């Protein structure tokens, strides 16, 4: 048995289920879940129609590398979205379709880490739990960079010692952040690329929330964009992860891609030739339709903007909470312990949120998730408004 499995922490939702044991919420109140980041807006009908249309491809094995048409569409989307030089991305070398970013983010560490060198995998804290699990099962030690209000919820990369960077083989960043919604600016991304060059590590940039943002004039910047502006048109040591789950409300499609450094992509393709399933062909054709359309993405953003505005109008007077730059999460500070808050809110108002400490670890003398909760505004607008009113009543009775 793999001994590294013993190092894995219980998953946040396992902890959450245990926390709620013994509570009996009021039966007259319908349950509203703000805990899970699963999009609830309608999937684009034209994408679903294309997938059904292509069901005859079930008789064919898909290629790990994916359809050329899909890789070309992804190149076009990246080039337009992040203002990359025309033809700087080669669909044969720089793009690899994957079954959603969760699987790819985990597998990437298994392919990149040399466990014989006492490696570190550096990651934000709090974080998407896959980063830590991937590091541990690859035989690496996670190194946590706290993100707090004092740092604008961005890791203080300047506080990392040279000795730590020397041991770093892989840096996970998440921009926009989960759960904070904070966006790493382009100058910081450029400095990270310089550090990767100096200390010889790879940057894995999780950008799956990049298309959900508040200001239509300020879309979040990306790692490839920073590399391009530096003249790094080969995207050396830079790899980005994108998905249709949040962008297009297609979490069940399990469709995403990895893009960047051609040498790294080639090694990852070799790994995936042995491990992982290729994306079904009908999913790939549906993905081509999704990546090729922006109107449904704009419409999706508008729905989230409406929910943020409505919910914050209700909660801001009674809760320490700010509108994030991007993502669909609120990350408020709680007036009581985050576990106590979560359990009592469920028991009294039949609303589920996620304690912040379940998404973070103790590091450098603190736990940055303590006394915060994650609220995912994924439910319909009316449900989000109802949830906000119940949370306000709950807070007024504390």
Map each language-model feature to its residues.
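PLP-dependent class I/II
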Residues: 2-12, 22-52, 84-398
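Conserved N-terminal alpha-helix of the aminotransferase class I/II PLP-enzyme fold
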Residues: 54, 61-99
């Amino acid at each position: 048995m793999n001994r590294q499995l013993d190092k894995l922490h219980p998953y946040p939702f396992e902890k959450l289920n245990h926390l709620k044991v013994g509570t009996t919420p009021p039966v007259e109140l319908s349950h509203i879940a703000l805990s899970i980041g699963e999009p609830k807006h309608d999937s684009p009908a034209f994408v679903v129609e294309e997938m059904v249309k292509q069901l005859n491809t079930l008789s064919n094995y898909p290629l790990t590398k994916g359809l050329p048409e899909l890789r070309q569409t992804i190149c076009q989307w990246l080039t337009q979205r992040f203002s990359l030089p025309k033809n700087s991305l080669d669909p044969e070398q720089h793009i690899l379709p994957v079954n959603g970013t969760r699987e790819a983010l985990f597998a990437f560490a298994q392919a990149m880490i040399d466990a014989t060198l006492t490696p570190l995998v550096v990651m934000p804290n709090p974080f998407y739990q896959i980063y830590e699990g991937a590091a541990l099962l690859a035989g690496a030690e996670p190194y946590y960079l706290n993100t707090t209000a004092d740092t604008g919820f961005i890791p203080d990369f300047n506080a990392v010692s040279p000795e730590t960077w020397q041991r770093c083989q892989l840096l996970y960043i998440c921009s926009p952040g989960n759960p904070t919604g904070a966006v790493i600016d382009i100058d910081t991304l450029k400095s990270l690329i310089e550090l990767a060059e100096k200390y010889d590590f790879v940057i894995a940039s999780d950008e799956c929330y990049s298309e959900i943002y508040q200001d239509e004039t300020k879309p979040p910047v990306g790692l490839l964009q920073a590399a391009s502006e530096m003249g790094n048109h080969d995207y050396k040591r830079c790899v980005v992860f994108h998905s249709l789950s949040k962008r297009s409300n297609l979490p069940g499609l399990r469709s995403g891609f990895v893009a960047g450094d051609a040498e790294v992509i080639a090694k990852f393709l070799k790994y995936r030739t042995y491990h992982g399933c290729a994306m079904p062909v009908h999913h790939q054709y549906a993905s081509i339709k999704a990546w090729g359309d922006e109107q449904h993405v704009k419409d999706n953003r508008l729905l989230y903007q409406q929910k943020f505005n409505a919910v914050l109008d209700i909660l801001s007077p009674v809760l320490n909470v700010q509108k994030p730059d991007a993502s669909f999460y609120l990350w408020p500070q709680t007036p009581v312990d985050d576990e106590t808050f979560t359990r009592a809110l469920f028991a009294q108002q039949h609303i589920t949120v996620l304690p912040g400490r379940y998404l973070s670890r103790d590091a450098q003398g603190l736990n940055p998730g303590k006394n915060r909760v994650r609220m995912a505004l994924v439910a319909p607008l009316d449900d989000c408004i109802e949830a906000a009113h119940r949370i306000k009543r709950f807070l007024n009775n504390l």
